[in-house]
Amino acid sequence: MKVTFLGHAGFLIEGSKKIVIDPFLTGNPLAKAKAEEVKADLVLVSHGHGDHLGDAVAIAGQSNALVVSVYELADYCARHGAQSHGMHIGGSRAFDGVKIKLTPAWHGAGFGTGEGPMEYLGNPCGFVIKIDGKTIYHSGDTGLFGDMELIGRFNSLDLALLPIGDNFTMGPEDALEAVKMLKPKTVIPMHYNTWPLIEQDPAEFKSAVEAATSAEVKILSPGESMEL
């Protein structure tokens, strides 16, 4: 299975199905891929902020893909022309062999264009994704929370995708504590260095995690892939 970092919190998972998560490409200063180049079967969106909703509707439309998110955000995507399936935190569903479960995330979720008030698009979430015998956790934008221990207890995680940027999400120190609770085999840091406000050194995070846990940290540049 191939996992490609699209930049910021965006990933493309390619196995028996293609899954795109939080595809913020247009307007992303570090993204290498263009939205029109990305094809998917499922598009997962963790919350309604523009740097996560991003190009989800466009990618879903050009691929005839299904957007999966919390109900309010799925409804928003449907109103903008995308096929969508709404869920809520704690719920799970299988989509043609891919099982998705929504997990909590501590963050906000409004969408705005800069004109007028933001539109509420439901609670933010993370995802536990089971595909081709592998289990992947994408936390979405979140702070550290104790129930990460339950996610790690109930799932043997092959890969965890965790933010380290601080300010809007947990920083490297809290992300290390998340790894201790989640107990994944591999971690890819995300949501850092897109802008100066979330600048971090992923090599320092890698050193701290690998010194304190059995997890391996893979640092991917936007456009770079790894085999899982």
Curated annotation (Swiss-Prot):
It holds the Pfam family Lactamase_B_3. One of its GO terms (molecular function) is hydrolase activity. Keywords: Hydrolase. SUPFAM superfamilies: Metallo-hydrolase/oxidoreductase. It comes from the Bacteria. Belongs to the UPF0173 family. PANTHER family: UPF0173 METAL-DEPENDENT HYDROLASE MJ1163 (PTHR43546:SF3), UPF0173 METAL-DEPENDENT HYDROLASE MJ1163-RELATED (PTHR43546). This is UPF0173 metal-dependent hydrolase PTH_1415. It comes from Pelotomaculum thermopropionicum (strain DSM 13744 / JCM 10971 / SI).
